């Protein structure tokens, strides 16, 4: 499948899905990718790639001169990300690694321009610390969080380690759903998008 648009936000229904594997929804994905500020040729790391929605869209943004690494601890997620990358024709500039962060990060002999951390890991402080070691100066990090504890832990870790220009945005999306008498707006869970830079 080809995505011929220059903006992120591939509709969720175009991705192959598995109910057991989380996915960054299209509106949140578009905002997270805009906070990453990806450029052609960038090297991007997606920690907790899940369905591969961020991995795929980041790959479209970096182009053939860039590379996107997707990491997940679940083999099913790695396989699903691979299938979605094949579906959108971007498998050629994606590297998929099965492993759990933060431990797996020290085995990657690369530096990254952009790092995305999805979901809510209990090890968020350790993941952020390990990310500091592999992100280039001027690189951006973006974290999606659902839990307030994740937000608190992420912000305190980012400040302590030295990330600058920290921002946090709370996003509440409601999608229209047809009912017998009209359209009702169904709210999704609030998501916090945290971003910062390595000086």
From Swiss-Prot:
SUPFAM superfamilies: S-adenosyl-L-methionine-dependent methyltransferases. The keyword Methyltransferase applies. One of its GO terms (molecular function) is protein methyltransferase activity. S-adenosyl-L-methionine binds at residues 24, 48-52, 72, 101. CDD domains: AdoMet_MTases (cd02440). PANTHER family: COBALT-PRECORRIN-6B C(15)-METHYLTRANSFERASE (DECARBOXYLATING) (PTHR43182), COBALT-PRECORRIN-7 C(5)-METHYLTRANSFERASE (PTHR43182:SF1). This is Probable cobalt-precorrin-6B C(15)-methyltransferase (decarboxylating). The gene is cbiT.
């Amino acid at each position: 499948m080809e995505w011929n648009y220059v903006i992120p936000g591939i509709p969720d229904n175009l991705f192959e899905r598995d109910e057991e594997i989380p996915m960054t929804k299209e509106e949140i994905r578009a905002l997270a990718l805009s906070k990453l500020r990806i450029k052609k040729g960038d090297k991007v790391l997606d920690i907790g790639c899940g369905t591969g929605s961020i991995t795929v869209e980041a790959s479209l943004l970096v182009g053939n001169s860039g590379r996107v690494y997707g990491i997940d601890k679940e083999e099913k997620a790695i396989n699903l990300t691979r299938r979605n990358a094949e579906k959108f024709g971007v498998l050629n500039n994606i590297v998929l690694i099965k492993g759990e962060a933060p431990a797996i990060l020290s085995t990657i002999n690369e530096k990254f321009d952009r790092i995305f951390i999805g979901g809510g890991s209990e090890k968020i402080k350790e993941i952020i610390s390990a990310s500091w070691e592999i992100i280039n100066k001027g690189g951006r990090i973006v974290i999606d969080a659902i839990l307030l504890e994740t937000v608190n832990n992420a912000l305190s870790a980012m400040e302590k380690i030295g990330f600058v220009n920290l921002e946090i945005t709370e996003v509440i999306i409601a999608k229209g759903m047809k009912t017998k008498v009209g359209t009702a707006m169904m709210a999704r869970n609030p998501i916090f998008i945290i971003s910062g830079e390595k000086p």
